[in-house]
């Protein structure tokens, strides 16, 4: 297509909003911990990330949203690798997370994990992306994905999987250490969130990451060959 543009410096900026879906193509490695209400699964998989921009919002210099404009954009697909965890729905109740806070807890934990991973694996925040959902069609449970933003993967998800225990624990510690009350760009807000950083629950993320650390316990991070030479399965 052809776009006509003009040079201008308006008193507002635009932020896109996008829908993202992740389809699990092949599970490379999975580990299961706990049982019943404390059941947690962590894994590494080949995935297809489908992203489609649906609208954008105009924000004034004060941060106030002026309006939201619908757009008709084609979806984009990325075949890559993702590290993930999914949990039994009862885990939230078991660890004191209210049902209405579950989406925000997952979303905030995802954002914080994306912010922390570069410190562990040496990537940039822009090199990775994520998705959280209270119910994923492939796992059948509440799930958080963090994926490489490059075709066929770049190794960041693999390293995140190998260092999952340290990653989750340090992510929780970073949120707790932040002095804000309800979440800020230093802990759970993301500059590239396609949902406008909504919903987010700082307390829910702390409780969720604490629950994961509790279930995983003193599990050592995986040795490199555990993640790089897995027994694959297909969904």
Annotate each predicted stretch with a short phrase.
Residues 1-178, 197-212, 216-219, 224-228, ...:
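Extended Lys/Arg-rich polyanion-binding regions
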Residues 178-187:
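Short cysteine clusters
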Residues 190:
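Cys/His-rich metal-chelating microdomains
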Residues 193-194:
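Short, non-ligating residues that shape and space the ligands of small metal-coordination modules
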């Amino acid at each position: 297509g052809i776009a006509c543009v003009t040079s201008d410096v308006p008193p507002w900026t635009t932020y896109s909003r996008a829908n993202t879906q992740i389809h699990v193509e092949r599970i490379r490695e999975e580990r299961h911990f706990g049982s019943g209400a404390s059941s947690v699964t962590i894994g590494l998989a080949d995935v297809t990330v489908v992203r489609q921009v649906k609208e954008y919002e105009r924000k004034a210099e004060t941060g106030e949203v002026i309006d939201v404009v619908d757009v008709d954009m084609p979806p984009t697909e990325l075949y890559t690798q993702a590290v993930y965890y999914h949990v039994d729905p009862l885990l939230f109740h078991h660890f004191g997370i209210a049902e209405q806070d579950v989406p925000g807890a997952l979303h905030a934990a995802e954002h914080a994990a994306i912010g922390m991973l570069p410190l562990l694996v040496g990537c940039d925040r822009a090199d990775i992306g994520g998705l959280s959902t209270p119910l994923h069609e492939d796992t059948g449970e509440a799930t958080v994905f963090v994926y490489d933003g490059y075709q066929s993967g770049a190794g960041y998800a693999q390293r995140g999987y190998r260092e999952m225990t340290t990653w989750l624990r340090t992510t929780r510690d970073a949120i707790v250490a932040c002095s804000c009350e309800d979440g800020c760009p230093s802990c759970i807000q993301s500059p590239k969130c396609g949902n406008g950083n909504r919903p987010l629950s700082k307390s829910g993320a702390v409780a969720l990451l604490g629950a994961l650390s509790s279930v995983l316990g003193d599990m050592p991070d995986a040795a490199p060959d555990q993640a790089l030479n897995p027994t694959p399965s297909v969904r």
